[in-house]
């Protein structure tokens, strides 16, 4: 089975999380965290920086590892490194996605997450249950206006 490595970013604004709806391909209309495939020789961190610049038009600062998701789709295995990050420059633009939405923690399941991204949402929920809202989001980046 083919294996694909991707990097994804969880971007927060207070207790809201940015979700993006795919606009193309097999998973069109599914919701995901922004990010994409690693290029040859690229680390997951480098891919996250590049993908957020390309997809959202923003520059990010330091990355904090959140989780790694291993998920078997019908035709490939996905290995997804997920990070929280801080936007240090730029304003989020809708460049490649059908739609984007800020979801507060009470409405995380209001969109139809892609299966691998469901695992990330579950990790966020566990973090909330174990640490409480304030501590769970302490490492989650805030959107900074430029």
PLM regions: where:
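Structural detector for helix-capping/boundary residues
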Residues: 15, 36, 50, 63, ...
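Conserved Nudix-box catalytic region and its N-terminal flanking loop in Nudix hydrolases
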Residues: 13-54
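A short coil-to-beta-strand element that immediately follows conserved catalytic motifs
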Residues: 58-68
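Nudix hydrolase/Nudix homology domain
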Residues: 26-31, 93-146
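Conserved N-terminal beta-strand and adjoining loop/helix that marks the start
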Residues: 1-17
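Active-site-adjacent beta-strand/loop module that shapes the phosphate/pyrophosphate-binding cleft
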Residues: 69-91, 101, 105, 124
């Amino acid at each position: 089975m083919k294996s694909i490595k991707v990097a994804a970013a969880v971007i927060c604004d207070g207790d809201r999380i940015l979700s993006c709806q795919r606009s193309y391909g097999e998973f069109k209309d599914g919701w995901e965290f922004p990010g994409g495939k690693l290029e040859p020789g690229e680390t997951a961190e480098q891919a996250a920086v590049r993908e957020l610049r390309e997809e959202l038009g923003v520059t990010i600062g330091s990355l904090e590892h959140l989780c790694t998701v291993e998920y078997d789709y019908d035709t490939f295995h996905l290995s997804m490194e997920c990070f929280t990050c801080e936007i240090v420059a730029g304003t989020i633009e809708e460049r490649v996605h059908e739609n984007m939405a800020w979801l507060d923690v009470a409405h995380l399941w209001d969109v139809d997450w892609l299966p691998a991204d469901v695992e990330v949402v579950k990790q966020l929920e566990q973090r909330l249950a174990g640490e409480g809202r304030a501590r769970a989001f302490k490492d989650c980046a805030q959107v900074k206006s430029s």
